Amino acid sequence: MAKAFENLEIWWVTGAQLLYGGETVKIVDGHSQEMVDGLNASGIIPIKVVYKGTVNSSDEVEAVMKASNNDAKCIGIITWMHTFSPAKMWIKGLQALQKPLLHFHTQYNAEIPWDTMDMDFMNLNQSAHGDIEFGHICTRMRVARKVVCGYWKTEAAQQKIAVWARVAAGVADAHNVRCLMFGMNMNNVAVTDGDRVEFEQRLGYHVDYYPVSSMMDYWKKVTDKEVDELVETYKQEYTIKIDESGEEVYWQKVRNAARAEIALRRVLKDEGATAFTTNFDDLGDADINDPNFAGFDQIPGLASQRLMAEGIGFGAEGDWKTACLYRTLWVIQQGMPTGCSFLEDYTLNFAGDRSSCLQSHMLEVCPLIAVDKPKLEVHFLGIGIRKQQTARLVFTSKVGRGIKATVVDLGNRFRLISQEVECIEPKPMPNLPVASALWVPQPTFEIGAGAWILAGGTHHSAFSYDITEEYWEDFAEMLGLEHVRINKDTTIPQLKQDLRNNEVYYMLNKALR
């Protein structure tokens, strides 16, 4: 079990009623426990499922739902109707529920026992009946949920539950995320800005400004011994490559990057933050030409890269939405093999049906997506208030399918946009000393890039090789977000119509609740 999931639980609640007698309820109880044990033993669902009993009345339903709200370990509820469970008894409980809901339409037995089946068997095994009744009341009440249909022992059904469970963990974590902005948004940039109050109300993330000058108190307390130890870690984890900067400048800048990382880690820990942003125009007020200068000589790119690999959300140029979304993505895909990163659309390569977009940034791309051991290099970065030589990890990404996602503020709502991409191998770029990925947007460059632009997408995104569109669909469902999906089946005319339809729906949506 991934560390991020160790103390989490999913509660399984079975629906029934007392119409069929107490012995029937005992059988339902036994079957339910066996099914929960089977899911836990499968090794597919990464979060422990806990059987919380069979509910037979409105009071019992309401009690377990309220208990789930008040238990921090519980990140979601799975419901299943073994017998018929009249849905009016679920109303108060569903009204009270504040955790994600998965409705599992399954059955204890896989097949009908044709030769022995009688009415007792029919009354006991009424999922076909009870789940439809439960589904109706959820739809009538506009309850957001995921519906999984299939036999509980099959890998296909278990995988869908696993997707939902991972996303529920990400949503639970989102409500505990504090994102620190070291400096504000880059001036005059629209897409990285937005309503931070509504963002917290809708998605749970809390975003605060934190002065770079306050971080300098931490900076000054970092010892040379601590810097030496971290530099030794760099030597073990990365390939040391000294280029035009020369050895003296190289190690000076690497040590400065190490000091920045130590200070930044301590601020985040003391402030209880799991995401942050930087801005190259706000690096503190110290004079870099002062012989006794102490502070950021450039943006803390190496620190950002390493912190992302450990699950700290990051957004460049004050992009707090992407910083928070990256944190959630990292939580969701804990234990998966291939990696995730903050990325930015940088430059295009027109090559017919393999036209692509180079993803990079000035410094901050996560080494989790590196195809080979990253190189630790020092080069000049001529942007922002301090144009200096600075340390960074340089690598190219793995090849393979992936998905990028972003959240944008449209004024009256937040929109989640996801897009399938194919990462391909770039040609050598000997004069570009930054980490990068090269991808072909799906379904084609022309349609995929056009769809992203029409949807109002950002130039920053949270990217993953390991998750799929289904994860982001569940995320949007849990948080009540609009989700625009761009994939192999996307066409521009249909996308335009969907966007127009969504404008109307989301204006009227609040009246339905």
Protein language model features and the residues they cover:
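Flexible loop/turn segments at secondary-structure boundaries
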Residues: L19-G21, S58-D59, S85-K88, A110-E111, ...
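Cap/lid and interdomain-hinge subdomains that line or gate substrate/regulatory clefts
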Residues: P46-K48, H105, A110-S245, V249
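Structural motif
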Residues: G53-A67, A157
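Short beta-strand segments enriched in small/hydrophobic residues
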Residues: A4-I27, N176-N185
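Short, well-structured alpha-helical segments in soluble
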Residues: V61-I75, I91-G93, E261-D270
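Short catalytic helix/loop segments, enriched in acidic residues and glycine
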Residues: K26-S42
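A short helix->loop->beta-strand "cap" motif at the edges of active sites that frequently abuts
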Residues: L97-L101, V143
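Anaerobic metallocofactor- and corrinoid-dependent redox/one-carbon enzyme cores
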Residues: H82, K99, H105, P113-M117, ...
